């Protein structure tokens, strides 16, 4: 992800379906991600040379708890075509094979069946429901589904 990607990613994050999960775009926050000042390592997702989303990971480096978490959003016009599954699977392979993580986690909203299906296709398994896990932009709480993938399951 570069600073040049920020306007496109902000436009994608502002799409109603994406904003419902990620909140309205904050240019300063996206610019921080592009500059590498965010706690996550961030990549733009491209399809045929066009930026269509964002994928990021955050790491727990303590060797006793070696794991990473993944977050992703895609433009509404490319959802449902397998790109989310492919992107998450590619990131999982990188985090396990190159970064040495034992466990990966992802935590979609419990009602986001499309995302859950994509993550299951990438190899993630449901672990449990986290009640009132995250507050939506409108202020109401919603449950999250904790999913994980162990290195030997990849």
Show which residues each predicted segment covers:
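Glycine-rich acetyl-CoA-binding "A-motif" of GNAT/NAT acetyltransferases
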Residues: 50-53, 114, 141
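Conserved GNAT acetyl-CoA-binding A-motif
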Residues: 97-107
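Acetyl-CoA-dependent GNAT
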Residues: 15, 19-79, 85, 94, ...
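Conserved acetyl-CoA-binding loop-helix of GNAT-fold acetyltransferases
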Residues: 80-95, 116-121
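Terminal substrate-recognition subdomain of acyl/acetyltransferases
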Residues: 139-154
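Conserved active-site tyrosine of GNAT-family acetyltransferases
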Residues: 119, 124, 147
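Conserved catalytic-core motifs of GNAT/GCN5-like acyltransferases
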Residues: 59, 105-108, 125-142
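A short beta-loop-alpha structural element at the N-terminal edge
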Residues: 1-11
């Amino acid at each position: 992800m570069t600073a040049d990607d920020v306007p496109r990613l902000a436009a994608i994050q502002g799409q109603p379906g994406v904003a419902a999960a990620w909140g309205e775009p904050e240019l300063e926050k996206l610019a921080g991600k592009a500059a590498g000042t965010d706690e996550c390592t961030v990549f733009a997702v491209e399809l045929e040379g066009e930026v269509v989303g964002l994928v990021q990971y955050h790491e727990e480096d303590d060797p006793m708890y070696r794991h990473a978490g993944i977050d992703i959003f895609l433009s509404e016009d490319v959802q449902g075509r397998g790109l989310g599954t492919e992107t998450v699977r590619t990131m999982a392979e990188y985090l396990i094979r190159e970064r040495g993580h034992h466990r990966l986690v992802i935590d979609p909203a419990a009602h986001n069946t499309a995302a859950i299906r994509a993550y299951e296709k990438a190899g993630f398994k449901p672990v449990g429901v986290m009640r009132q896990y995250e507050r939506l932009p409108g202020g109401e709480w919603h449950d999250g589904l904790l999913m994980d993938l162990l290195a030997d399951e990849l």
